[in-house]
Design a protein with these regions (language model features):
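PLP-dependent amino-acid enzyme catalytic core
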Residues: 31-158
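Intrinsic disorder/low-complexity segments
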Residues: 1-31
Length: 158
């Protein structure tokens, strides 16, 4: 399978031995190695739930390798996004956290930032599209964030 070969080659390459940033519109992609992942896992351990893995027979057959799925739906916010939100907030300085955070999302990322900010005592403003389902808006507010609705997601970047 070509994709699997490409992924394996990438992870064996020397490129990932050091962190570097790649500029992409509206985001930065960070390259990291397994030690960075272990450090992040330890950092967020007190704040996230350890979810279980389950072997997937159908997925394993489909892609040709032993595959397990991780049940991140059991995180407090119902998704894996809390891991990244906690990790980011925990790597910010006290001065940076004191300024608060702003996120743009109409879904799981919004709730993850709102929840992790609330737990860590950081003010959060979440910009959400005006057509975001009310259940997501309510959940995000329920975690303590200030929600500002935008006519479209692009307006949040202006």
């Amino acid at each position: 399978m070509r994709i699997r070969a490409d992924v394996n080659a990438y992870f064996r390459s020397a490129k990932i031995r050091s962190i570097r940033f790649i500029r992409v519109p509206f985001c930065y992609i960070t390259q990291m190695d397994i030690n960075d992942i272990k450090i992040a896992a330890e950092r967020i351990r007190p704040y996230v739930r350890r979810t279980h893995l389950e072997y997937s027979n159908s997925l394993s057959k489909r892609i040709g390798v032993h595959t397990s799925v991780k049940f991140e739906l059991f995180q407090k916010t119902g998704a894996f996004k809390a891991r990244g939100a906690f990790n980011k907030l925990l790597t910010m300085s006290d001065a940076e956290r004191a300024k608060g955070v702003v996120a743009v999302s109409g879904g799981n990322h919004a709730q993850a930032v709102a929840y992790s900010s609330s737990v860590l005592g950081v003010d959060a403003v979440i910009l959400m599209p005006a057509n975001t389902p009310q259940v997501y808006v309510d959940a995000t507010r329920g975690y303590g964030a200030t929600v500002e609705l935008q006519e479209n997601i692009g307006a949040a970047f202006v």
